[in-house]
Amino acid sequence: MGQDSIVIKGAREHNLKNIDVTIPRDKLVVITGLSGSGKSSLAFDTIYAEGQRRYVESLSSYARMFLGQMDKPDLDSIDGLSPAVSIDQKTTSKNPRSTVGTTTEIYDYLRLLFARTGIPHCPECGKEIKSQTTDQVADEILALGNGETTKAMIMAPVVTGRKGEFTKLFADLAKEGFVRVRIDGEVRKLDGEPLTLNKKIKHFIDVVVDRVVLKSSATSRIAEAVEKATSLADGRVLVQVLGESSTEAQSSYTSSGATGGLAENEHVYSLALACPEHGHSIDELQPRDFSFNAPYGACPECLGIGTSEEVNESLVVPDPSLSISEGCLVPFSTGNYYPQVMKALCKHLKISDKTPWEDLPTKAKRAIMDGTGDEKIRVDYLTVSGRETYWFITWEGARAAIIQRRDEASSDKQREKLNAYFSQHPCPACKGKRLKPEILAVTVGGKSINEVTALSARESLEFFQSLEFTGQNRTIAQPIVKEIIARLQFLVDVGLDYLTLDRATASLSGGEAQRIRLATQIGAGLMGVLYILDEPSIGLHQRDNDRLIATLEHLRDLGNTVIVVEHDEDTIRSADYVIDMGPGAGENGGYLVAAGTPEQIQNAGSASITADYLSGRRKIEVPATRRQPQKGYISLTGAQVNNLKNVSVDIPLGTFCVVTGVSGSGKSSLITDTLALALANRVNHAHKTAAPYKKLTGVEAIDKVINIDQSPIGRTPRSNPATYIGLWDDLRALYASTNEAKARGYAPGRFSFNVSGGRCEACKGDGQIKIEMHFLPDIYVPCEVCGGSRYNRETLQVTYRGKNIAQLLDMTVEEALAFFQNIPGIARKLQTLFDVGLGYIRLGQPATTLSGGEAQRVKLASELQRKQTGKTFYILDEPTTGLHFEDVRQLLSVLQRLVDSGNTVLVIEHNLDVIKSADYIIDMGPEGGDRGGKVIAHGTPEQIVKANVGYTGKYIAKML
C-alpha cells in the first residue's frame, strides 16, 4: 500500500479534524472545497511541510543552515512521501534583475549560445569583427591585386586621432630604420626636414612599412610587412592600393582608418578581435559577458538594471493650475522652512508666487526644478516663535533637494513618501538594454541577445526553430538550441506564449509567476517528485486551460505525483483522483467529505457542495435581467501602454462590468495601469503616474474610485483583518468599558499588543521568541511567559462574556459574529467579512498568512461597511482567486449589492460564472502579446455571443 499511495494518518494541522487520507502516487490529484475548508492545510502545511522536512533532515548540519527550518506538522504518521516541490503564488521575486528568461534558465542557455557561436560586430559601423592570422591577412591583401602589376603600400596606423607633436615617436621610428610616414593623408620623409605638427589638433599617423607589387611571388614579403605593421600598431595594418602607377597616391582622406569611412582604395585588417576601422576591441567571448548581473558585460551606468531613477516634475507638480503660494510644489508646500524658501526664490527670479505654475516662464521653472547655480539668494525667515532673521543660500533645485531629503530620511515612512516623486526611465547609456554596446553588437541569426529576449515566447520559439548553423557551430549549437526550444515550448504550453523573456518577474501576476515556475520544473525533467501547486489556473482564460491541464498531465507522465489545490471545473474533471474537503469553512471544515475519481465525487452525497455543482444540482443562475446603462459612461480614449493599440473604451456607470480576454490581451494594461490610475488622479486627487492616454471624460458622475487589488493588507504579523477593517479599535474600547477594566483604570491602549502596558514584554507582543541557533536555522518558540497570547496576565484577567482579548483574537469571523450579534456596530463589520466569504479566518490572523485573494476580500469588506453614496467606482482584478463555486456565488451577491446601491463595479475576470452574470462585457484580444491589445467586442453577454469574435463568446455561450 505504501508503495503506490501516500498514506496520511491523523492529520490535525490548523482546522483538520484528525483525518486519514490516502492519495494515489504518480497521479494528478485535485484537492478542492470551500475557502477555509482545509485544502492548503492538507496540501501545503501537512504533505509538503513533512516531505520538505524529511528531505532537509537527511542533509548535513552545514547544508541545513542554509535552508529554512520547518516544524513537524501535527499528524500521527505519513508514508509513501517523495521529496516535495511547492509551486505557490507568494514566492515571486521582486528583484529588478529577475526576468522571465533568468527564472526559466532560458537566459543561461542564451548566454552560452551567444558566447560560443555569436558573431561580434563593431558597435559603431556594424561591420563583423574577426580575428585573423598574419597569413590570412597576407592572402587577403594579395587578393586586392588586379594582375601582376598592382602595387600597394602597407602601413602601420600608429596614431589615430590624437593631439600632440609626436617628436619622440618620429625619432624612434627613424632609429628603427623607417623612412616614410603618412601624416593626415600626406606622405612625408623622416630623414629630411624635422617634422613639426600642431599639437592642438588631432592627427592620424601611419608608418609606411613597405611598398609591394601584389603578385603571388611576393607573398612572403607581404606577410613580413604585415607582421612588422601589426607589431607597431597593436595588431592592425592599413593597406592602400596604388594601382599600376609607381607614384604614391596622396589620399585626401585624413584618417588612418580609426574614425570612419575609409577611402575606396584603403583597407584595414586586424589580428585581434577588434574593428580595424574604429579600434573597438573585444576579448574572447565568455557566457559571463552576456550577463547583466556581472560587471564584465553589464552597462556601467545602470549596472545592468536597465533603468535609472529620476525626480518626475509631473509628480512634484501634480496640478499645474495652482501657484507656488497655493502649494503646487507638493514636497515643498508644508512646514515652516520650505514655503519661505520658495517665496525667496520667486523674489530672486522676479516672478510672482501667485502665478499658476503652468503660466510661469520656462526659464523660471527650470531654475526652480534644476537650481540657480552659484547665485546667492536672500531668505527672509520668520521662525516658529515669531523671530525675524535672514540668511543667504544657493538653490540646487527641487530635484536635488528631494534626492538629498530621501537619502537623509530617518524613517522608512519618510523615505517611502519621497519615493512617490520618483519615476523609472530607461537608462540613457544602454537605452534599457542592460548590456555594454560591444556585447549588444554580438549576433546569432542576425539578432543581438537583447533583440532575442524582446521577442515573445512564441516568436522566440519560431526564431530558434528556423535558426541554421554551419560547420563547427552546428555541433556546438545543437544541444544548446534543443534546450532553449524545449523550455520555450513549455512556456507556450502553460499559456504564457505572450510573455517576453526580458519581462521583469516583479511585474507578473501570481498565476503567471506560478506557471513560469511550473514550466521551469517541467524543463528540469525530474522523476519521482511530489509537486504541490496552488491554483495554477489563476489568470488563465478558458482557452488556455486545456494546455495547462495537458502540462500537468505531462508532469505526471514523467513519473511524478502532482497534487493541485484547485476550484476550476475543467481541472477537477481532468483529475485522476479528487479529494473534497469541507463541509464548511474554518471550524466547520477540516473533514474529508469525499474522495475518488471525478465521476465518484459527482455522485457523492449531499454533504459535498462540490458534488452538487459538478452534477448540476446547484448552479449560479444567470441574472433574469441585465441593467441598462442609464447614468452615462466613463470614456477613456487613446490608451497605448505595453501592447495596447491606441485603445478607446466606454464603461457604463451604474452597472456590473467585466473586462475579459485571453492572457496577455491587455486587460491589466488598460484597467490597472491606465484607467485606475487616471481616475485616481482625477477623482481622488492622487499623485500617480498613469500610463499614456489622450482623454478621460465622464468623471464628474463619480465621487470616489476604489481599486481593490491583491497586495497584502500589512507587511508584518502584527497587522490582521480586525485592524484593517477598523474593528480592533471597537473591540479595545469594548474591553476598556467593562467594569473590571474601569476598576483597574485601563484605557483602550491597554489592550493593544503594539505598545507597552498591556502586552507581554518578554516577547514584545509577538507571542513568540526567536532563538538564534548559530549554524542551524533560527527557530521560533511560543513565548513561555504569555504562552503565545501576546498579553500579560493582568490584561488577560479582563473578560467580556467570559472571553479575554487573546481568546477573542483567536475566534473565527463566524464565531465572533454569533458572539457579538447584540452589538450592532461590531456585528455590522463582522457581517461584511462574512459576506465576502471570510467567515473562516481568525480575527487576529497575521496579515502575512493571508493569500492574495483573501487580502483582496478583506479590503472589499472594509469598503462594504462604509456609507454608500451610490457614486463610487470599484475596480477589482480577479476577485474569484481562491474561491470555490459556492464562494463565487456569495461574492457575486455582494458585488451585485454594490451595483444595486447605484455604484459601478468593474472587474477583470476569467471565471465564466462571473462573466455570465455581468451587465456589460468588454472583451480584449484577439490574442495575447503583440497580437492582442484591442477591444474586439463589447455589450451584454448575449451580444458578445452573437458577435462571434474572439474566444470569450464561445465559452459563455454554453453557460447562458
Name what the model sees in each region.
Residues 1-960:
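Conserved phosphate-binding elements of NTP-dependent enzyme cores
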